[in-house]
From Swiss-Prot:
Protein function: Cytochrome P450 monooxygenase; part of the gene clusters that mediate the biosynthesis of the host-selective toxins (HSTs) AF-toxins responsible for Alternaria black spot of strawberry disease by the strawberry pathotype. AF-toxin I and III are valine derivatives of 2,3-dyhydroxy-isovaleric acid and 2-hydroxy-isovaleric acid respectively, while AF II is an isoleucine derivative of 2-hydroxy-valeric acid. These derivatives are bound to a 9,10-epoxy-8-hydroxy-9-methyl-decatrienoic acid (EDA) moiety.
Protein name listed in UniProt: Cytochrome P450 monooxygenase AFT11-1
Note: Gene clusters encoding host-selective toxins (HSTs) are localized on conditionally dispensable chromosomes (CDCs), also called supernumerary chromosomes, where they are present in multiple copies. The CDCs are not essential for saprophytic growth but controls host-selective pathogenicity.
InterPro entries: Cyt_P450 (IPR001128), Cyt_P450_CS (IPR017972), Cyt_P450_E_grp-I (IPR002401), Cyt_P450_sf (IPR036396), Cytochrome_P450_monoxygenase (IPR050121)
GO biological process, one term: biosynthetic process
PANTHER family xrefs: CYTOCHROME P450, CYTOCHROME P450 MONOOXYGENASE ASQL-RELATED
Cofactor dependence: heme
Keyword set includes Metal-binding: yes
């Protein structure tokens, strides 16, 4: 018996023809290579610039773009309600979310694909981030923020007119965010802010592992590589933090509140495995989005001194002294503080790429078009947030767009449209429940920084220099897309404000 040698060229041509013309997603436009293969999506995921790549594709092909054979990106403000809203015929795309599970049946509220399980557990989780509980976390947050500010103050030169630094605020914000989430989960700190070799090494391991988990969603075969396993130090940190939270006598940690949570209708509890799974997600994903939002906001303020001054004026008008700035309800009333965060997260979302959803049996109608069963779809947050249909001068940093009220109906209508389009914490039943907590944490940090210091940017790698289709004005913050967004760096010089009063308030003298 003889065997014919397989004709690889013919096989490739046949597969390509079927994917381009006969595939269930073939009606959606996109580059021919993207229609044939996932290699471009994998490449840009590896580069960390997939959100910007999707923006370029949408500028060329329109609102619907096929960026991989079975993946369609939808750039339209209605996609949030049509795809991510309640009772939609979609589920989380398991290939993307399964790498984040400790075991196949060991799921967190965030990465479970089971709609009923998510609904039950999310109802409990929402209680952890209600206004009733936010004040309970204030002390843990304040302790770490004060330590952060103490270190910044100690680095000042004796000559108060000389700028300190430069220091990498992107790294510093990541450090304090990791410390805060560790203390919120376990009631204890790890010592990230100490800056010792052990904590610095673990921080590097965490960042690398988050990136690896993200890449596994695009290329699952990578999990066979030994380098894609967590390091021993990382595994110990996750396990120990979870166990400490379970053993802690404090009632104000996330773990303690998860254990105490009850579903009023069904009397459902978080099991120990549920707690560990959610604690793991908080530890890995709960800090990167916070640090990203803080870094982005500081970046845009540094490059827009007028807006920086307006924020400072608001803070001085609300808080007579530095010590009056606390993680409480009064901080939530700082309208301009909220506006600069909203605008920064629009231009540099903490989760800039799309969160994929698998279309269920019977298909779905999204943004006026039918999408067949089995197609993976999602909203490209970065691209939608720079769409001129929803924002005046979409690439320009304009916090005032979020401060409209009923006295200006036109501006108010534009703000409502912008609110529909910009969803940095996602939308619907799967939206991030910790938005209010993130604002308290970041709001406290930013308010104290702006209140205490004059700051200026240093020429660094924080600005994207490449030319992007449709973007000819404004600045693009250099983010590396992973589980959330990691910033390349943000180098800053700073000094105490020159009124001479702040120094006593910050140092406590």
């Amino acid at each position: 018996m003889t065997y014919e040698k397989p004709d690889l060229k013919r096989t490739k041509a046949t597969v390509s023809f079927k994917r381009i013309y006969l595939h269930r997603a073939s009606e959606f436009p996109g580059p021919w290579l993207c229609q044939c293969s996932s290699i471009m999506a994998q490449y840009h995921a590896w580069r960390g610039d997939l959100p910007r790549y999707l923006h370029v594709l949408h500028e060329k092909y329109g609102d619907f773009v096929r960026y991989a054979p079975n993946h369609v990106s939808i750039r339209h403000c209605d996609v949030w309600e049509d795809v991510y809203g309640f009772q939609r015929n979609v589920s989380k795309y398991d290939t993307t979310y399964s790498p984040f599970r400790l075991a196949p049946d060991f799921t967190s509220t965030w990465n479970t694909s089971n709609v009923d399980v998510h609904k039950s557990r999310r109802k409990l989780l929402n209680k952890l981030f209600s206004e009733q509980h936010l004040d309970d976390y204030g002390t843990l947050i304040t302790v770490q923020v004060d330590e952060f500010m103490r270190q910044i103050l100690e680095a000042l030169p004796k000559d108060k007119d000389v700028m300190a630094g430069p220091i990498n605020f992107a790294y510093k914000s990541d450090v304090v965010a990791r410390e805060i989430i560790t203390s919120l989960v376990s009631g204890q700190t790890y010592g990230f802010q100490s800056g010792d070799a052990k904590s610095a090494s673990l921080l590097a391991d965490i960042s690398k592992f988050e990136r690896k988990l993200y890449l596994l969603g695009f290329a699952p075969w990578l999990k066979m590589l030994p380098s894609f396993k967590p390091t021993l130090a990382l595994a110990q940190w996750i396990v120990q933090s979870s166990k400490q939270g379970l053993a802690s006598g404090s009632k104000n940690t996330l773990v303690a509140k998860m254990l105490a949570a009850r579903d009023e209708e069904k009397d459902v509890e978080f099991s120990r495995n549920d707690v560990i799974a959610d604690a793991r997600f908080f530890l890995l994903g709960g800090s990167v989005t916070s640090s990203s939002a803080l870094s982005a906001t500081l970046f845009f303020l540094l490059h827009h001194p007028v807006e920086m001054q307006e924020l400072y004026d608001e803070l001085r008008g609300i808080f007579p002294t530095y010590e009056d700035i606390k993680a409480d309800a009064q901080l939530m009333r700082c309208k301009r503080l909220r506006a600069v965060f909203e605008e920064s997260m629009r231009l540099a979302p903490p989760v800039p790429t799309l969160l994929p959803r698998l279309v269920g049996p019977g298909g779905i109608k999204a943004c006026g078009r039918y999408v067949p069963e089995g197609v993976v779809i999602g909203a490209p947050c970065w691209a939608i947030s720079r769409d001129k249909r929803y924002f005046d001068k979409p690439n320009v940093f304009k916090p005032d767009r979020w401060l409209a009220d009923s006295s200006d109906p036109v501006a108010l209508e534009k703000m409502l449209l912008a609110t529909r389009a910009s969803q940095p914490f996602s939308y619907g039943p799967r939206a991030c429940p910790g938005r209010a907590l993130a604002f308290r944490e970041n709001g406290l940090l930013l308010a104290k920084l702006v209140y205490a210091f004059e700051m200026e940017p240093v020429q660094d790698k924080s600005i994207v220099e490449e030319s992007l289709t449709g973007i000819c004005d404004g600045l693009v913050f250099n983010q590396l897309d992973t589980v959330g967004a990691h910033e390349v760096e943000l180098m800053v010089r700073y000094r105490l404000r020159l009124d001479g009063k702040t120094k006593r308030r910050v140092s406590g003298n």
